[in-house]
Each structure stands twice: as structure tokens, then as C-alpha cells.
Amino acid sequence: DVSDGDIFGFAMNLDAASGSKTVIVQKNGSTIDTVTIPTANEDNIFIPIAGDTSGTDSILKMNFGGTPNPTPSSAVSDANGFGAFEYSPTIGGVAYLALCTKNLGSNG
């Protein structure tokens, strides 16, 4: 179920050295699913897509750690000090990073 104001988080681990590549899905700061990317697809390009099939007008806002609108009430940064997230991007002891040019190459 999705309600007005729900915040979804997506954390991707595509680091080959870490073992299996995964996508973690969170709703309001709690993990609701972890998807392991099959080996046959691990070299593919991943593009985030969101949609609504309810048949009513909806607004979906995406934030990849940049300057969100509206500003999160908690505004948590990643381990490198970048991003503005409503919930901590550290999940299960893994410090996920904001998708920004300053983080590219810092860990991958």
C-alpha cells in the first residue's frame, strides 16, 4: 500500500568486489525488499523508473541525494557529506552514497 507522503528509498550495490549485486527498497525508512541482480544482467545499464497505475492524478518526486523539494525534515547526508535524505543512507552497516559527480569514482 502507498499513501500520500510515503517516502521510498532505493539503495543499489553494483560493486563487483562485494559479491552479489543488490537493490534494496525502503518505505519510510524501513527495508521492504532486497532484490539480487541475476549474474546474466549484472553488466546492464540501470535506469530508475517510477510510475502510477491507479488511474488518478499523482505526483512522483525523485531525489538522488541532490537538493530535494520540499527539503527533508531530517536532511541526512551520506558518509562523504553529500546529499540530503529524509532517512539515513546507511543500511545494514553499508554506507550508500548520493548519486552525484563528487561521489563518482570515490568508491567505484
Where are these regions (language model features)?
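PRY/SPRY (B30.2) beta-sandwich protein-interaction domains
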Residues: 1-108
